[in-house]
């Protein structure tokens, strides 16, 4: 393996260690009470290393959203299929519920990012379904079903997170709803 790829791998590992330290601190502290020094002390890495990867805590937070969801949605879609991918995502959100409860309260931009991630997953649902069916979806139909359902699922999962309810319990309802809507479009 080349030095470039080794450094890149080391970089991602370091970012994940920093992100985990931040998430751990969020379990017992308010977002605004956590300093970069606190994060790096928890990570057991020198403070300056934080700034090699992130300008500030907001950038770290954005990286966490993008990285965690991308790993769950993009990295697993071909291997697991959309239904298992959905289940993995709901379980992940359940396991990290306190973190996301706090984030929803302090960061209104996260809701938009959360919506985009649901749209990405639903794009894959339609793509997967289109491969299994003779029906060819128009761009308008794809856009409608993805955006409509993403908004609904985003709102329901956000509310469940804030209330502390299990998201895994929503799994069969979400799957059944999506399959029923797909069947309507395909008929």
Curated annotation (Swiss-Prot):
This is HTH-type dhaKLM operon transcriptional activator DhaS. In complex with DhaQ, upon activation by dihydroxyacetone, activates transcription of the dhaKLM operon. Binds the inverted repeat sequence 5'-GGACACATN(6)ATTTGTCC-3' located upstream of and partially overlapping with the -35 promoter sequence of the dhaKLM operon promoter. The keyword Transcription applies. It comes from Lactococcus lactis subsp. lactis (strain IL1403) (Streptococcus lactis). Homodimer. Interacts with a homodimer of DhaQ. SUPFAM superfamilies: Homeodomain-like (SSF46689), Tetracyclin repressor-like, C-terminal domain (SSF48498). Keywords: Activator, DNA-binding, Transcription, Transcription regulation. PROSITE patterns: HTH_TETR_2 (PS50977). The gene is dhaS.
């Amino acid at each position: 393996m080349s030095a470039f790829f080794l450094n890149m791998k080391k970089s991602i590992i370091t970012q994940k260690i920093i992100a985990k330290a931040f998430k751990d601190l969020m379990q017992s502290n308010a977002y605004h009470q956590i300093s970069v020094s606190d994060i790096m002390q928890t990570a057991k890495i020198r403070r300056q290393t934080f700034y090699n990867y992130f300008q500030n805590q907001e950038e770290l937070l954005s990286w966490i959203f993008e990285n965690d969801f991308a790993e769950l949605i993009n990295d697993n879609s071909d291997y697991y299929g959309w239904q298992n991918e959905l289940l993995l995502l709901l379980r992940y959100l359940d396991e990290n519920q306190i973190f996301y409860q706090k984030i929803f309260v302090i960061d209104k931009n996260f809701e938009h990012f959360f919506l985009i991630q649901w749209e990405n997953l639903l794009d894959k649902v339609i793509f997967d379904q289109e491969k299994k069916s003779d029906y060819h979806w128009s761009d308008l139909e794809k856009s409608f079903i993805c955006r409509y359902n993403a908004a609904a699922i985003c709102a329901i999962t956000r509310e469940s997170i804030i209330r502390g309810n299990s998201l895994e319990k929503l799994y069969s309802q979400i799957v059944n709803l999506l399959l029923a809507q797909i069947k309507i479009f395909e008929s």
